[in-house]
Amino acid sequence: MSWIERIINKSIITPTRKANIPEGIWTKCDSCGQVLYRAELERNLEVCLKCNHHMRISARVRLHAFLDQCSKYELGSELEPKDILKFRDSKKYKDRLIAAQKATKEKDALVVMKGTLYGMPIVAASFEFGFIGGSMSSVVGTRFVYAVEQALLDKCPFVCFSASGGARMQEALMSLMQMAKTSAALAKLRAQCLPYISVLTDPTMGGVSASLAMLGDLNIAEPKALIGFAGPRVIEQTMREKLPAGFQRSEFLLARGAIDMIVNRLDMRWRIARLLAKLTSRPPLKSTNSQENTC
């Protein structure tokens, strides 16, 4: 017992308790450092409430927020990746797949859904960056083609949200073939005059940016998204020159005509719906930016 406890009446001494706060309640913004309430950040679609920084969001959460709630149906969910080449670098490809599937609860890096957007029939796809960097595998390419074929069958628009490091090196040439495969599928969509909107999110790089991500009738980007083929560090090392500030960011690309517009994630659902209404000669939507996706 300390000397202060001997002097002061024990009845007025209240032992302190450690606050029992569960993990994951709070998170910090990568851009401004603001401490954010996790549940509030999720309601705001992973956009910082202080600085508007767009954090990465899972493919499934993005699609559920984008499409009308009562109409979603997943396509290609039965497809799973195979380690045909028995590839191994610092780790077996098979083990990488198991770890990625466990971490993301997805079978591969692309989720495709058929549904409606403000009542308009639509097919939408979204990359899961948490699955081996959103890299494009044979399954990703096949699911993308499934999405295009469904859009052709339903004669409806197709929207794809890209977030990828490029082709999956563990599948070698089979992964590179998906660039041509997805591009050929999109050519069929264009031949039928069906709209394809590509939304480039952070990051969209490599073989994905060199194929399906830049082939949209409209190419939209989220704010400050990294978009390019090789990364800025690789370019600097190759050219031995310092790159301009903001190089390969969506604002830099918009100023030079490489993309069509930049749209905040919270406005994306409404803006795309309005664009598709015009592209498909539908009646204009009511002039309200409602983010509710109920039917």
From Swiss-Prot:
GO biological process per UniProt: fatty acid biosynthetic process; malonyl-CoA biosynthetic process
Subunit and interaction comment: Acetyl-CoA carboxylase is a heterohexamer composed of biotin carboxyl carrier protein (AccB), biotin carboxylase (AccC) and two subunits each of ACCase subunit alpha (AccA) and ACCase subunit beta (AccD).
Cleavable signal peptide: none
Cysteine disulfide links: none
Physiological role: Component of the acetyl coenzyme A carboxylase (ACC) complex. Biotin carboxylase (BC) catalyzes the carboxylation of biotin on its carrier protein (BCCP) and then the CO(2) group is transferred by the transcarboxylase to acetyl-CoA to form malonyl-CoA.
Organism: Baumannia cicadellinicola subsp. Homalodisca coagulata
Name of this chain's protein: Acetyl-coenzyme A carboxylase carboxyl transferase subunit beta
Cellular compartments annotated: Cytoplasm
